[in-house]
Amino acid sequence: MLSRENNELLTRVERGTPMGSAMRRYWIPALLAWELPAPDCPPVRVKLLGEELVAFRDSRDRIGLIDEHCPHRRASLFFGRNEECGLRCVYHGWKFDVDGRCVDMMNEPESLHFKEKISVASYATVEVGGVIWAYLGAPEQRPALPTFAWTQAPATHRHVSKVVQETNWLQGLEGGVDTSHAPIMHRVFKADSTRPGFKPTHPFVRSKAPTLVVDVTDYGYQYASLRPLDEANIHVRTYQFILPFHQIRPSQSEGGHPIMSGHIWVPMDDENTMVFNWDYSETAPLTDDDRLERRLGNGPLDVDQGTFRSTRNRRNNYMLDRQVQKTESFTGIEGINTQDRAIQESMGRIVYRSREHLGPADKAVIQARRLLLHAVKTVSEGGTPRGVAGTYYALRAVEGVLPRDADWREALTPEMSATRIEQTV
């Protein structure tokens, strides 16, 4: 259970809120690089932390992220002309460069020098790993560049997609760090099923309810689900949570070679989230079959590539098939992440967490809330929150079958490149 006051504290992210101020200490994924494919291409609307922005790539290939609304009469710069190193409002011809400076006014005499008094809000950007990231905080507090391991893989070895989730960001994050739901909600009933999900033979499904261990670190936490398989062995699956909204988890390609994957739950505003989904291989280029979006429900066949809204959504009950639910899969909904969105959106835009009843299986959710509340407090007191140092960029997540008497940390932590563990809960 979370008090109503703390629920408000964690879920409200717009400017001037404590959580919004904490979020502005981190690099935030803003859009996919292919959305701005070339200099002087059309601008793109972006909404981050309640701010309505527009992104553009200028004639010199520089990326601008500025207030969407022209300061003259508040017309949208989305309709503007991206030309000659600036974005020009089509209403009265005011033009702004990537730094937000007004560089030309078509309706005012040059002799007045009025343009020198006008600017729009602009934010720092960097293109890393096929994603354009934004920093909305104070320049002197800018953190290390977001060079996560997946962003450094060759373009042929990684893939990134995104999809809108119609809930507050915390619902998505909590669903991501909640491992106990996966073998329940995402299971399929037949060993030879072609539907995405955990088959009856998977250790997730074969084992009993997991024991969860959470190790708090200087970036967030690493956590493991320990599932008994038989008298001799346990299945261990580890994850990483990096403040404020990153998850890293182990996956596997259709061909069987390891793939690392994860999600980033980016708050658009208090009630909508843009979920960035990434996967990469350390050993081989990704094939079309390898790309997890096909199984997760995040690909072009499932998500409109203009609006980034899922074709399976609350307005059509996520195309739930009751016959499939009866005979083939636990939910009857196609796509693992589509199932996640369906259930998380069913909880309302912002969950009333004061009405929850949490148990031991919710340990990772509880600890995530504690760390986020601590980050809010740290920032409000002028400190530096966890997760901005950049020491965590090489983190990985792994899974394996180990003897029951094995020390899973000793066996697996070296493969996770984890930094200092501070406490265990």
Where are these regions (language model features)?
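Helix N-cap / beta->alpha transition motif
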Residues: L31-L32, N168
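Short, flexible, glycine/charge-rich loop motifs used to bind or transfer phosphoryl groups or to couple energy/partner
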Residues: P18, L77, K162
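A boundary/linker detector
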Residues: M1-W27
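Short, charge-rich amphipathic segments
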Residues: R4, P18, A22, C102-F114, ...
